[in-house]
Every structure is written in structure tokens, then in C-alpha cells.
């Protein structure tokens, strides 16, 4: 019994100290991480900040196009509904107008006046809707021009930076063995495929 107790005491003495928050525990964890402590960013290192910024601009542009399309569809629905309401009121008005004036009752005359006023209000509402759509269209054209200028300005320096970085990487990197050819497509090549090196096809 005394031998077992002495052995357990000896093993506990040799066991390394790993207290929560202790310096020994922190040092032990740091040694286990190894090269992982050298990681600075989890982002893809093949993309430059300029490429990331341009990609974000393209995504923002796509989002704007989707919002515009939703607005256009809402305008079309409102316009169709207004046209239906106007046509229904006109049809009812034509039926009342077809009745001779002497044969019309007081209620029919009042209804005729109400229909004329309703049709007038709906026509005005549709005119306002068309005017708003035209103003929105002009604003979108101005935004398209600004975005085209932005992409053109961003693509010029990015083209130079990509070419210089690609040439420097080609000098440092040895040629791959012929049995394992590799083809790397840079971010600029992807941008050219989408935007034609000047502006996005969406515009």
C-alpha cells in the first residue's frame, strides 16, 4: 500500500503543470500550434486588394440591376391595373351615355358624373406614374455612366499591377513538370471575361 502511494506521488510530481490561464499552459499551447501562428489572413492570397474592390463593385452593380428590375415589374403591374380600372369605368360610362338624356334618372346622371371624375383621377395618376418612370430611367442612365467610368478607371491600374505581379511570379517560380501542367487564371482574366476589359455586360 505504501509503495502504491509513493508511486502515485512520484507520477503526480512528474506530470507537467497545465493550469487554466497559467504561463506554462500558454507556452505549451503555443508550441503545439507551430506554423499556424504565422497565418495573418484567411483571405485568398491570389487576389489583390484592387481585384477584391473591383469584384465588390461588380456585385454591387448586379444588386442595383436586380433592384431596378423589381421596380420595373412593380411599375408594369401598377400600370396594367390602372389601365384595367380605366377601361372598366369607360365601359360603364359608355353604357350610360348611350341612354337618351330625357330617359336618364337622377341616379344615372349622378353616376355618370362620378364615373367622369374617377376616370379623370385615374388618368392623372397614370400620367404621374409615367413621369416618375421617366425620371427614374434618366437617373439610371446617369448611374450607368458613372459606373462605367469607375470600372474603366479601376481596370487600367489593375491591368498594370496584375501584369507586373504575374511576371515577377513567373521569374521566381520554376516551370512545372511536363507531366503535370497547370493553368492559372488570374482575377483580371475573369474580369475581362465578364466585363470585356472596359465595362460590365450588364450596362
Swiss-Prot record:
BP GO terms, sorted: cell motility involved in cerebral cortex radial glia guided migration; microtubule depolymerization; negative regulation of cell motility involved in cerebral cortex radial glia guided migration; negative regulation of microtubule depolymerization
PROSITE patterns tied to this protein: BMERB (PS51848)
Transmembrane segments: none
PANTHER family assigned: BMERB DOMAIN-CONTAINING PROTEIN 1, BMERB DOMAIN-CONTAINING PROTEIN 1-RELATED
Gene responsible for this protein: Bmerb1
One Gene Ontology cellular component annotation held by this UniProt entry: microtubule cytoskeleton
Protein name as annotated: bMERB domain-containing protein 1
bMERB domain mapped to chain residues: 3-149
Region described as Disordered: 160-186
Organism whose genome encodes this protein: Rattus norvegicus (Rat)
Amino acid at each position: 500500500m505504501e509503495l502504491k502511494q509513493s508511486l502515485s506521488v512520484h507520477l503526480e510530481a512528474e506530470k507537467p503543470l497545465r493550469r487554466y490561464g497559467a504561463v506554462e499552459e500558454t507556452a505549451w499551447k503555443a508550441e503545439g500550434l507551430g506554423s499556424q501562428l504565422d497565418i495573418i489572413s484567411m483571405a485568398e492570397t491570389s487576389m489583390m486588394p484592387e481585384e477584391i474592390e473591383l469584384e465588390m463593385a461588380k456585385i454591387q452593380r448586379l444588386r442595383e440591376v436586380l433592384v431596378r428590375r423589381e421596380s420595373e415589374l412593380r411599375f408594369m403591374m401598377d400600370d396594367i391595373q390602372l389601365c384595367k380600372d380605366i377601361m372598366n369605368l369607360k365601359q360603364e360610362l359608355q353604357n350610360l351615355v348611350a341612354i337618351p338624356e330625357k330617359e336618364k334618372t337622377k341616379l344615372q346622371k349622378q353616376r355618370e358624373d362620378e364615373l367622369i371624375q374617377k376616370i379623370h383621377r385615374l388618368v392623372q395618376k397614370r400620367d404621374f406614374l409615367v413621369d416618375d418612370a421617366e425620371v427614374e430611367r434618366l437617373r439610371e442612365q446617369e448611374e450607368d455612366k458613372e459606373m462605367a467610368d469607375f470600372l474603366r478607371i479601376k481596370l487600367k491600374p489593375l491591368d498594370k499591377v496584375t501584369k507586373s505581379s504575374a511576371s515577377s511570379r513567373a521569374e521566381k517560380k520554376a516551370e512545372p513538370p511536363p507531366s503535370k501542367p497547370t493553368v492559372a487564371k488570374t482575377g483580371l482574366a475573369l474580369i475581362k471575361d465578364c466585363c470585356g476589359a472596359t465595362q460590365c455586360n450588364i450596362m
